[in-house]
Amino acid sequence: MILEKAREILEEHQLCNHCLGRLFGKLGKGTNEERGRAIRLLLSMETGKEYKEPEKCELCGGVFNNLDKFAELCIKAAEGIEFETFWVGSRFPEEIEKKEEEIWRKFRVVSGEKITKEFNRELGKVIAVRYGKTPVKERPDVVFIVEPFSEKVELQVNPIYVAGRYRKLIRGIPQTPAPGFKESIATIICRAFKKHFHGKCIFKGAGREDVDVRMLGNGRPFVVEIKRPRKRKVNLKDIEEEINQSGKVEVLNLRFITPEEAERILTTRHRKVYEAIVYVKDGITKEEVEKVVKSLKNAEIKQRTPRRVLNSRADLVRVRKVYDVKGELIDDKHFKLRLVTDGGLYIKELISGDRGRTTPSVSEILGKEAWCEILDVLEVLDDVEGDN
């Protein structure tokens, strides 16, 4: 039945061995070219008629004879780009794909393989053998999109994702570039990444601290995306050392990650440990500090979006929890608070009350005006909110 169908097709169409074999591509093993050559030979033996391969195939135009040339075009397109893994895609003229489908319909072909699939696979084999690169479908370093009939190659360079944590050692630096500031956490970190990877750097932090707040302890999680990197073989320890020489920011635990891991890091809320120096206008006693500690421990805080961020945040009431509190009297107007809270709780407003928008607050508990003079984030805890 296969030979009869092949004979009928060859009576009407001038097909090369690749395109003939591809009509039966889902049957048996071996390449389409081998399959087509075998079918042609069997037909000749059975009928006594020679079924020679045409000089030019009416379907593919002979593109499979030029795979070495297309491989060279791909490597040339990637000149200066460091890569080890790749994948191949292709764009054939619409009329070619339609003609292939018409042959399938007319001769009731049910075991065929699309021309693009064979071309991508066979070109991938040539690139792998000639240039020592590895074809990988999931997250390759680069993707070659080949247009065989126009001999054009489009190069897609996939981004690199790196995760880590940063410590902010001094006050007065925003997390991302902002008017009135010469530098930011993002610019300090990205400067080193751009230098080593030779690509565009995008910094994203898992939450942020205010400009006047330090981030200490184990640091805040962040992700860097490097778009169109020209270098991939980079020692992340070298980047760590370079950033840490700034004296302003330190990074630790840099590691390569997947896009899915990046999404998880940036969307997971973690409990945080804060240390605040609180000023009480009308004075504070040791007993009042103990009252604050007792009132806030395990308290649920209803917090309306702080007035100072209303221009960039929706005006909503959010419920966050304070898990643990420790207090220490410093002098008659100052005391220290150490808090373990849900992520997303604004600590300055937890202290001031923000004109009643946060309740309970230190000001509300004391019945006195209080505000935060100094604030540090001591830790971003690894346990996810809600875990025991």
UniProtKB/Swiss-Prot annotation:
EC number(s) on file: 5.4.99.25
Keywords attached to this entry: Isomerase, RNA-binding, tRNA processing
Catalysed reactions, as listed in the record: uridine(54) in tRNA = pseudouridine(54) in tRNA; uridine(55) in tRNA = pseudouridine(55) in tRNA
Keyword ATP-binding carried by entry: no
A GO biological process held by the record: tRNA pseudouridine synthesis
All copies of domain THUMP, residue ranges: 35-159
Binding site for substrate: 274, 346
Residue numbers annotated as active site: 210
Temperature dependence: Optimum temperature is 70 degrees Celsius.
Record-level Gene Ontology MF annotations: pseudouridine synthase activity; tRNA binding; tRNA pseudouridine(55) synthase activity
Family to which this protein belongs: Belongs to the pseudouridine synthase Pus10 family.
Biological function: Responsible for synthesis of pseudouridine from uracil-54 and uracil-55 in the psi GC loop of transfer RNAs.
Protein name: tRNA pseudouridine synthase Pus10
Source organism per UniProt: Pyrococcus furiosus (strain ATCC 43587 / DSM 3638 / JCM 8422 / Vc1)
